[in-house]
Every structure is written in structure tokens, then in C-alpha cells.
Amino acid sequence: MSKRDYYEVLGVGRDSSERDIKKAYKRLAMKFHPDRNPGDKAAEASFKEIKEAYEILTDGDKKAAYDQFGHAGVDPNRGGGGHGGGDFGDIFGDVFGDIFGGGRRGGQRQAARGSDLRYNLELSLEEAVRGLTKELRIPTLAACDLCDGSGAKKGTSASSCGTCHGQGQVQMRQGFFAVQQACPTCHGRGKIIKDPCGKCYGEGRVEKSKTLSVKIPAGVDTGDRIRLAGEGEAGEFGAPAGDLYVQVSVREHGIFTRDGNNLYCEVPISFSKAALGGEIEVPTLDGKVSLKIPTETQTGRMFRLRGKGVKSVRSHAIGDLLCKVVMETPVNLSEQQKELLREFEASLTGAGASKKHSPKAEGFFDGVKKFFQDLNS
């Protein structure tokens, strides 16, 4: 009797993610689980078919072989020479691994460590500079609390696999070669679960969300990563959990930009303040401070406020705040103000006035004049 397509069994498309496949499996496994359908042979057969499809489609190598060769690519009974099936990567890996001492001799496959998780955390500049403790809600796979992660129904335990006799591997012939492969019955574990847990359906893990209090150190920046050991997904059947990596990104700020441990900002000043000098207030992350502006300050001049930047997350060094003053042209002038400016402009004209009061402009226009003279000569 021909087998149904594994994707059809689970009701998923060929481009479905592993997460979608897991969701489909859990929904169907709950529906057809023998504990929910006692004595129903059809439900039991459906459950076995669903479990088989799930095991193939969540194993990267087996899924690739199935996608390429169909059921023949994952049929453990198709071995002897020819291209009829089998996982060729595993076959040749075993052959050459044995020759060069690599191989997978020595018993059953160890239960897999849990997957690492990544959490993207966005912070304001103030939060990144000062540090804080954040409550993070993490969706993950946790050890099943009903079976304590064993996958077996409460009161039972996994039994030794009858196919490989607990070794996790079987010997198969490939033409002239006898090679070792992971046991197709227990998938290399050496044990099988005859009575799966009714909560995790033999997986030993369940989907769960947990809340963690994570301390974010002062001075972090976009691209920094914080590792929380053992806070990733639970491992298979009691294996160690993976790690959680918190990936930091810092939002753009309305006033400051950051470069390493230094902060930068632009501060507008009036024409009169730039010419006559005086004190202005500039913002810092700790509040406003006074900045003395010398007379005849030109727009674009940079002022450094030492120690007003960011404390390094990796040392005790503290950056600076660099303020660039930008002269702002007055707008919405009254007629009286315009007249005063005209009088002021007139006071700057005359022989030598431009050179005295605007040396850069004088030099610029002299250069322009010379440029056109050279062009026409």
C-alpha cells in the first residue's frame, strides 16, 4: 500500500517553516492521540502516520532527501547498491569516517542540546547610556512538566529499541560496503517511547512563554549582544538548554547622535551672540549646562564638553559631548529691525571694511575675481 505524501498528512505546504510543521503536528497529534481515542485502530494508525511525517519533515537531512527522492529517499529498507534510496550524505560520511577514524562508532546519538534563541531589544538613547533592567517575555520550548522532559507517559519510561538493541545504530550493506547508520526506528537514540506523554506527545518539550529580568549594562550600543546562558530552548530529553542572545539596537534621538562614546549635537545661536559672545545653555543627558561663547564665533565651530558623553560598557572611560554652534538668521523682522540692520550693513562698507570685518569673505571674493581673470586671459 503506497504511503501518503508527508506534507499532505500534516496539511502543510512544501514551503512551510519548521514552526508551522510543529504546530500542525501538535494539532493533529492531539486529535488522534491513542489516549483520546481508546480502542480506535483508525485513530492509532493516523497518529503513527502523523508522527512519522513529523519526524521526517523536522529532520533537515531527511527532509532534503524526501523532497528530492520522495519516500524512497527516507526508506531504511532500500539499501543495497544503486540509487534507490537512503541518505547518501550519511552513507558516504560513514564509509569515509570509518576509514579516517571519524565515523559514528561507539553507540547511540546523544540527545540534542536546545536551540539558541535571539531577542531583538530596542532601547532609547537614555536607556542605553544609563543602563536598566528590562522584563522580557520570551516564547520558547520548555521541558514538559508532566513527564519531566522524558517524553514518556507518567509512570512509564522509554524502553530499549528492539531494532538496534539499544545501540542507536544498525549495520547496513551498501554494495560491497557494510556501514553503520542511525537506527531508523529510534533515530539513533537507542530507546523508544511506547507510551508517549499526553501533554508533549513524546517530544519531551512544550511551547511556553517565560518572563526574564535582564540587566542591560550602561553604555550599550546598537550591535551589542548580551548572552544569557541556558535561557534558550530546552534540550531534547533532558539535554542542556540553549542560550538566549539579546540583540541591542538604539533608536535615533531627536537631539543627540552617538559615535562610540562621544555624543554630538547642534546648538543654534543668534547673529548677535556669535558676534558679541556670551553664555548659552546647551542640553546634555544629565540636564542643561552653560557654555561660554567667545566673541566673533563663526558658525560651525565645535565646542567640547569633557565627560558629558557615554561611559564605555567595556572600560571606565567616559566620552565627551561635542556641540556645533550654528548661527541662525533672524526671521519675521519688523520694519524698525530691518532699518537697524541696514544701518549696520552700511557701517561695514567702505574702504577696507570688508577686509577688516569679513576676512574670509574678502579672501573668497578675491579668489573668485582672480578665477574669472585667469579664465578670460
From Swiss-Prot:
It is found in: Cytoplasm. A zinc finger (CR-type) spans 131-209. It comes from the Bacteria. Its cofactor is Zn(2+). One of its GO terms (biological process) is chaperone cofactor-dependent protein refolding. Pfam families: DnaJ, DnaJ_C, DnaJ_CXXCXGXG. GO terms for molecular function: ATP binding; heat shock protein binding; unfolded protein binding; zinc ion binding. SMART domains: DnaJ. Residues 5-70 form the J domain. InterPro entries: DnaJ, DnaJ_C, DnaJ_domain, DnaJ_domain_CS, HSP40/DnaJ_pept-bd, HSP_DnaJ_Cys-rich_dom, HSP_DnaJ_Cys-rich_dom_sf, J_dom_sf. The keyword Thylakoid does not apply. CXXCXGXG motif repeats lie at residues 144-151, 161-168, 183-190, 197-204. Binds 2 Zn(2+) ions per monomer. Zn(2+) 2 binds at residues 161, 164, 183, 186. Keywords: Chaperone, Cytoplasm, DNA replication, Metal-binding, Repeat, Stress response, Zinc, Zinc-finger. Zn(2+) 1 binds at residues 144, 147, 197, 200. Homodimer. Belongs to the DnaJ family. Participates actively in the response to hyperosmotic and heat shock by preventing the aggregation of stress-denatured proteins and by disaggregating proteins, also in an autonomous, DnaK-independent fashion. Unfolded proteins bind initially to DnaJ; upon interaction with the DnaJ-bound protein, DnaK hydrolyzes its bound ATP, resulting in the formation of a stable complex. GrpE releases ADP from DnaK; ATP binding to DnaK triggers the release of the substrate protein, thus completing the reaction cycle. This is Chaperone protein DnaJ. It comes from Shewanella denitrificans (strain OS217 / ATCC BAA-1090 / DSM 15013). The gene is dnaJ.
